[in-house]
Structures are given as C-alpha cells and as structure tokens.
Curated annotation (Swiss-Prot):
Residues 254-258 are annotated as: ACP-binding. This is Beta-ketoacyl-[acyl-carrier-protein] synthase III 5. GO terms for molecular function: 3-oxoacyl-[acyl-carrier-protein] synthase activity; beta-ketoacyl-acyl-carrier-protein synthase III activity. InterPro entries: ACP_syn_III_C, ACP_syn_III_N, FabH, Thiolase-like. Catalyzes the condensation reaction of fatty acid synthesis by the addition to an acyl acceptor of two carbons from malonyl-ACP. Catalyzes the first condensation reaction which initiates fatty acid synthesis and may therefore play a role in governing the total rate of fatty acid production. Possesses both acetoacetyl-ACP synthase and acetyl transacylase activities. Its substrate specificity determines the biosynthesis of branched-chain and/or straight-chain of fatty acids. Keywords: Acyltransferase, Cytoplasm, Fatty acid biosynthesis, Fatty acid metabolism, Lipid biosynthesis, Lipid metabolism, Multifunctional enzyme, Plasmid, Transferase. Its main location: cytoplasm. The gene is fabH5. Pathway: Lipid metabolism; fatty acid biosynthesis. Pfam families: ACP_syn_III, ACP_syn_III_C. GO terms for cellular component: cytoplasm. It comes from Streptomyces coelicolor (strain ATCC BAA-471 / A3(2) / M145).
C-alpha cells in the first residue's frame, strides 16, 4: 500500500425546478410549519426530466474543472436511483465525461453511498490500482416517491455532488484519514423499495411491481440514525486522535436537522459547527454530503487546515464516517 486519497476538487448540480413547502401543502395534509418543525426543510429541487445520470455528468464536469483536470482513472457513482436497473449508470456517465475506457461502477448504499464511494475510491488509490478518481453522489428521488405520502414526499430532493481525488501523501491537507463503515441487514425493511427486484419482480400479468415507491419507518430510522452516526463518527475521532472540541466542521448526511443536532450533541461538538444544508435542498441521499460541503465552501465556513468530520446513515442499514484536513480547493 502507498500514498493516500486526497481531495482535489468539488462540483455540484441541482435540477431547475424548485419545490417549496407551500406547493406541497396544496395536495398534502401538511403546511410549512409542520414540515420545518419536524425536519428543518424549507424547500427542495425536483427534476423535470433530467435523469440521475444527467445530474451526475453536470456535477462531474464541475468537479473536474475545479480540480483543473479532464481525466481520472476511476469513476464511482453512489445512487439509489440509477437510470436503469441494468446496466450500471457509472459507465454511461464516464463516457459522457470523455472518460470511456476507465473503470466505472455504481454503489448502492442509499444515504451512506457517498461515504462508501469515497472509501472505495481511496482504497483503489492507496493500493496503487489507480492514480485518481471521480466520486459522485447523485439522486432523483422524485421518481420513486409516493406523491400522496407526506412522510416521504416532503423530505427528499434531487441533486448531485462530485469530488475528484488524487494520489498524495497522508500528511497533506485533503487526505482522507481513515474510514469507519458498518451495516445491519436485520433492519433492512426500515428503509426499502419493496418491488422491482428479484423478490418482487415485474411480470407480463403485472408489469408494474407492487411496492414501487420508497418507504421509510420514520421513528425507528431517527433513533438508529442518531445511534449509528454517533458511534461511527466517535470511532473515527478515536482513530484520528481528534477531540470533539477540535472539530471545526461536522458535515453529516442531511436527513433531518434534529438528527444532525442530536448527533452533534452526543459527540459533544458545538452545534454552531454543524453544517446544515437541508433547509434549501432537502434530503438528497447520496448527494447530501458533497452538496453540504459545497454550500459551506460558498459561505466561507471552510478554511484550509480545518478539521472536517463527515458521517452518514442510510438504508441497508448502512453507516459510515471519515475525516480530513480541509485543503485549498475550488468548489463549483
């Protein structure tokens, strides 16, 4: 093993259609106060035709430009909403980015997908298999939501975020300082799209599989999200030797503002250091962490050398955390 995976550039993309809480309240039994008080979400973006791959390409282009390069050796796409069940979306994204021929694959770890994608790409780099990678989290959850289910429709948004990683030294800014990953398949039904796979497949007599919509059991998911993100992020702090007080920015998966603040409280990280982005984009699943990082960059919340802790939780159940010293990079 040699070197480290180092963050070199960041890019994001959002679809054009802005969906406010007020718009949703016109056909759902809800209102702006109900949504904000329970989730912290004020609006989200939904695609009017752009696919997950389309958003991934746009974010990828911006990340490559931010990194000052037009090529990488590997493309990893984290998504729950691929363009097709088969084939994977990443090879098409790579081709459209002018990267045909490089290794490219999808990762399905739901809202933990971006952390899993980072871990996979960094492992390739440190093993000497590739010298650089593009990691993308992209989602179009609007395509899998039940429009009449207020427990999910008010939460999720569409978007994409991408980062370029390069080979470098573990002691330089931007190097990822280890990962903590985990899963619990016994709780797989807490977050699930029941239909469409080999257990409940489409057939000639029933072309639309039952249970085609995304479902989530909110209360237990909330509890497990807080527990698992706290444990995982805590393990990463132990590994890096950082104290909670030394963390400059905590960037968690943007599922719910109450979850993020609960995790920060349990970790004893100052709540003012927690980055919140879901108020403007909702829960964008695998795209949420890079989107939040981009916003933090744009608002001057991240400076070179800052200690940044990332943590996520998602269906599977899955969870993961990583950390880095923030580099001097461009976010587009």
């Amino acid at each position: 093993m040699s070197g480290a995976g180092v963050l070199a550039g960041l890019g994001t993309a959002l679809p054009a259609r802005l969906v406010t809480n007020e718009e949703l309240s016109r056909h759902l039994d809800t209102d702006d106060e109900w949504i904000r008080s329970r989730t912290g979400i004020g609006q989200r973006y939904w695609s009017d035709g752009a696919s997950t791959g389309d958003l991934a390409v746009e974010a990828g282009q911006r990340a490559l430009k931010a990194a000052g390069t037009d090529t990488v050796d590997l493309v990893v796409l984290a998504t729950t909403t691929p363009d097709h069940p088969c084939p994977a979306t990443a090879p098409d994204v790579a081709d459209r980015l002018g990267l045909s021929g490089v290794a490219a694959y999808d990762i399905a770890a739901v809202c933990s997908g971006f952390i899993y994608g980072l871990a996979s790409a960094v492992a390739h780099i440190t093993a000497g298999l590739v010298g650089s990678a593009l990691v993308i989290g992209a989602e179009t959850y609007s395509t899998i939501l039940d429009p009449l289910d207020r427990t999910t429709s008010v939460i999720f948004g569409d978007g994409a975020g991408a980062v370029v990683l390069r080979s470098g030294s573990v002691d330089e800014r931007g190097a990822f300082l280890g990962f903590d990953l985990g899963s619990d398949g016994a709780l797989k039904d807490l977050i699930v799209i029941p239909g469409g796979g080999s257990r409940e497949r489409a057939a000639a007599e029933r072309p639309q599989p039952a249970g085609a919509y995304f479902t989530m059991q909110g209360k237990p998911v909330f509890r497990h999200a807080v527990t698992r993100m706290t444990s995982s992020a805590g393990a990463l702090l132990d590994r890096t030797g950082w104290s909670p007080a030394s963390v400059d920015r905590f960037v968690g998966h943007q599922a719910n503002a109450r979850i993020l603040h609960a995790v920060a409280d349990q970790l004893r990280i100052d709540g003012a250091r927690t980055v919140i982005d879901l108020d403007r984009v909702g829960n964008t699943s695998a795209a949420s962490i890079p989107l939040a990082l981009s916003r933090a960059c744009g608002e001057g919340l991240l400076s070179p050398g800052d200690r940044v802790l990332l943590s996520a939780f998602g269906g599977g159940l899955t969870w993961g955390s990583t950390a880095l010293l923030w580099p001097d990079i461009t976010a587009l």
